[in-house]
From Swiss-Prot:
Pfam families linked: HSP70
Signal peptide range in chain numbering: none
Residues modified to Phosphothreonine: T173
Protein name: Chaperone protein DnaK
Swiss-Prot/TrEMBL keywords: ATP-binding, Chaperone, Nucleotide-binding, Phosphoprotein, Stress response
Family indicated by similarity: Belongs to the heat shock protein 70 family.
Residue span of region Disordered: 576-608
General function of this protein: Acts as a chaperone.
Family matches, as InterPro entries: ATPase_NBD, Chaperone_DnaK, Heat_shock_70_CS, HSP70_C_sf, HSP70_peptide-bd_sf, Hsp_70_fam
Species the sequence originates in: Streptococcus pyogenes serotype M12 (strain MGAS2096)
């Protein structure tokens, strides 16, 4: 069975891992980094992903960041003169990760386990699966990020029982999960979180502070200047990271804008104390989900054995202190918070292929599921933190006499009224025989699969007629849209491959020209005139082809030059070998003379 890669598709950074033997290994990107910025930019018709895209974010307005925050919505982003869905942009990131994983493995990759925040709803999970499909990946499993982290943490601890709390604060989302580990079973007891809280929010606090201070001093609002704002974002992220290691950092942005008197510069120092003050409310928001998860798991703090920190934002000292204060425990630092989720996803891939044995993952649904009933009430069929996959049925009836049809309004959330929860979809069960209200028996069944994706069935128990749908959110993509996007992605991949081939050829040509010119110079006056002239002629022809830019001509002339250069190199080698042989012969003769002299015995002359 081919390898299943594990992908952590993050808001600010993503990572890919693969199982090698029994070890999960992070695959470095082409720049040698173990995580890849979740950034996509467009330039001259080319799609650029990762570090290169992030570097040009300041100067290139066609750059998309933090697309994960829009997953599961109908919101589109404009770039490159086109509109893109969040699924398409995410697919470009996935395609890039897939590409360099294939380069590392030396084989095609077609399957993946992709992680999502535990608190992602059905629409967001479906959007993630669609993004994988567009990228040419069969998504074998959608796994909650804290669960994947626990899997990586607990793989070598299957012989002992423990309860762990995973505190996962990423770039754009926050999750808390409580798991019980024992005998290879990873059982999620409860999960809670906030999909609108992450490292980006901490950056934004610094940006707002810098904008306000600059406006106070210079009367100019930098938030209205797109390029200045991007520079502020980069500076804020760097300052945040600096303050995890030092207590004060300098923010220096020369020529940030211009005033009536000329260019203006932003120079400001930011202390950790000030940063903590600016972000106090964000840190405070992490506490409620921790308490909620403990309450749902029916556990006290004393029953938690370990606290695992996941996500780059858990490096913020105030966050670490808040976790200590809230749990009464020193966090376990045995895992890398940036890499552990992708590693866990790769382990789950190994479970699916059978390479990892005796491991069972029992995940939960993060939000309650149900339907709208009379009076706009939300009636739950499946409570949050129910282990998945699961199925639950309940019988309902009509609200009016002779009602011919019932509308099934499917919802996800925790509020008592339907209007306050997230609509997953609507469908209708028709042709109900005429009967007084309350008589028809309508059985509604909810199914949640292992990926947390929902399907609903309504059945008239009198006529046995049923209606069945896999929930597609109003913001989701149709199969036709997914197919079109897959074709676009394939076309882009072909164009990218062609572009890479062109670049490789041009580099090869440059290298061949440089090497041949060097050889011709070195062999001047050494008697290889025929071979040197042939190589020079082939070199001139290749340079002319290079000037014209005709790739086929360049390829042909490169082959011709390589042939002539090889002939010249052979002559050089033969001459060098002959010279070496002659030198060895001379040494041999000298050695013989020395040996003959050794036979002469010195006599002693005595005068009489």
């Amino acid at each position: 069975m081919s390898k299943i890669i594990g992908i952590d598709l993050g808001t600010t950074n993503s990572a890919v891992a693969v199982l090698e033997g029994t070890e999960s290994k992070i695959i470095a990107n082409p720049e040698g980094n173990r995580t890849t910025p979740s950034v996509v930019s467009f330039k001259n018709g080319e799609i650029i992903v990762g570090d290169a895209a992030k570097r040009q974010a300041v100067t290139n307005p066609d750059t998309v960041i933090s697309i994960k925050s829009k997953m599961g919505t109908s919101e589109k982003v404009s770039a490159n003169g086109k509109e893109y869905t969040p699924q398409e942009i995410s697919a470009m990131i996935l395609q890039y990760l897939k590409g360099y994983a294939e380069d590392y493995l030396g084989e095609k990759v077609e399957k993946a386990v992709i992680t999502v925040p535990a608190y992602f709803n059905d629409a967001q999970r479906q959007a993630t699966k669609d993004a994988g499909k567009i990228a040419g990946l069969e998504v074998e499993r959608i796994v909650n990020e804290p669960t994947a982290a626990a899997l990586a943490y607990g793989m070598d601890k299957t012989d002992k029982d423990e309860k762990i709390l995973v505190f996962d604060l990423g770039g754009g989302t926050f999750d808390v999960s409580i798991l019980e580990l024992g005998d290879g079973v990873f059982d999620v007891l409860a999960t809670a979180g906030d999909n609108k809280l992450g490292g980006d929010d901490f950056d934004q606090k610094i940006i707002d502070f810098l904008v306000a201070e600059f406006k106070k001093e210079n009367g100019i609002d930098l938030s209205q200047d797109k390029m200045a704002l991007q520079r502020l974002k980069d500076a804020a992220e760097k300052a945040k990271k600096d303050l995890s290691g030092v207590t004060q950092t300098q923010i220096s942005l020369p020529f940030i804008t211009a005033g009536s008197a000329g260019p203006l510069h932003l120079e400001m120092s930011l202390s950790r104390a000030k940063f903590d003050d600016l972000t106090r409310d964000l840190v405070e928001r992490t506490k409620t989900p921790v308490r909620q998860a403990l309450s749902d798991a029916r556990l006290s703090l004393s029953e938690i054995d370990e606290v695992i920190l996941v996500g780059g934002s858990t490096r913020i000292p105030a966050v670490v202190e808040a976790v200590k204060a809230e749990t009464g425990k020193e966090p376990n630092k045995s895992v890398n918070p940036d890499e552990v989720v992708a590693m866990g996803a790769a382990i789950q891939g190994g479970v699916i292929t059978g390479d990892v044995k005796d491991v069972v993952l029992l995940d939960v649904t993060p939000l309650s599921l149900g339907i709208e009933t009379m009076g706009g009430v939300f009636t739950k069929l499946i409570d949050r933190n129910t282990t998945i996959p699961t199925s639950k049925s309940q019988v309902f009836s009509t609200a009016a006499d002779n009602q011919p049809a019932v509308d099934i309004h499917v919802l996800q959330g925790e509020r008592p009224m339907a209007a306050d929860n997230k609509t997953l979809g609507r469908f209708q069960l028709t042709d109900i025989p005429a009967a007084p209200r309350g008589i028809p028996q309508i059985e509604v069944t909810f199914d949640i699969d292992k990926n947390g994706i929902v399907s609903v069935k309504a059945k008239d128990l009198g006529t046995q007629k049923e209606q069945h749908i896999v929930i597609k959110s109003n913001d989701g993509l149709s199969e036709e849209e997914i197919d079109r996007m897959m074709k676009d992605a394939e076309a882009n991949a072909e164009a990218d491959a062609k572009r890479k081939e062109e670049v490789d050829l041009k580099n090869e040509v440059d290298q061949a020209i440089f090497a041949t010119e060097k050889t011709i110079k070195e062999t001047e006056g050494k008697g290889f005139d025929t071979e040197r002239d042939a190589a020079q002629s082939a070199l001139d022809e290749l340079k002319a082809a290079q000037e014209s830019g005709n790739l086929d001509d360049m390829k042909a002339k490169l082959e011709a030059l390589n042939e002539k250069a090889q002939a010249l190199a052979v002559k050089m080698y033969e001459q060098a070998a002959a010279a070496q042989q002659a030198a060895q012969g001379a040494e041999g003769a000298q050695a013989n003379d020395s040996a003959n002299n050794d036979d002469v015995v010195d006599g002693e002359f005595t005068e009489k």
